[in-house]
Amino acid sequence: MKPENLNSFSTLSNLVAKDSNLIVQSTRMEFESNTYVSELWRMSKGNWRKFKSGNNNFSNPKFAKKSNDIFYVKTNRSVEDKSKSKKASSKIEMQSGRSVSSVFEIEGSINNYLLSNNGKFLYVITSEWNEEFKNIESKDSEPMYYENLPFRFDTRGIIYNKRGNVYKVNLETGKSEKVVDGDKHNIISIDSLVENNGVLTFSYDKHNSKGTMLEERIGTLKNKKIVDIFTKGMMGNLFYYGDELHAVGLRNRFEWPTNTTILKF
């Protein structure tokens, strides 16, 4: 790869398949605007063709459980350009045939989303400004003061003024409700989310009791309350094998150089 060809360098991710349908996310750097361009490509008659592209970024495609509908995240690309002060606008859209409808929209980042096993709901993980910081117009120029500096950082950069939330979206009515409130529980970020028999389990970061570092925890949502089932390790990438919950990571925090492992709960 020569320097003059860097504009053509793309990375591929989020490959999804259903029957003979394939969709993949392609991301490249646009150096003139200093921003990432993310598009969706679809396999059609043996050839890859652009499925979603334009002035917005498109990412994280998923096929519906019981139909041929396609979901994806659409993000205002100006959000990626830090020199612009436009508010973030992220939404999940659903394409059914040639019809496109907005399923969920938020002023903030959509980190991931999960289709319920019955196909009736979406569970959306977001990263939003906390209540105290949300109404500050020029957030980049606002000074920030910290009594403690946590050891770990998440991938979003300014984590101290962000909170992770989970919304439940009814695909039939279009209505949504916040089922995990990051402001209430002081959740800095949410990494992984799974559902089994209608019960949500997720891994998340929050400050320890002294406020000196971030701790990874795994919690289950029961009657709108978070019940922690694992607190001493560094776990993420939750998944079910059969009806048993598994996680990828370390049994004990900072247990280096122990190899990453898969643990069954």
Report residues per predicted region.
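Multi-bladed beta-propeller domains
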Residues: M1-T11, W41-S59, S85-N111, V169-S189, ...
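Conserved beta-propeller blade repeats
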Residues: S8-L22, N55-V73, V79, E107-I125, ...
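Beta-propeller domains
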Residues: Q25-K50
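Short glycine/acidic-enriched loop and turn motifs that connect beta-strands
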Residues: R28-E32, N76-D81, W129-E132, K206-K210, ...
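Predominantly five- to eight-bladed beta-propeller fold
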Residues: S38, E80-S89, S127-Y167, L214-R217, ...
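A generic tandem-repeat structural signature
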Residues: S67-S99, F133
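Solenoidal tandem-repeat scaffolds enriched in leucines and small polar residues
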Residues: N130-K134, I158-E216
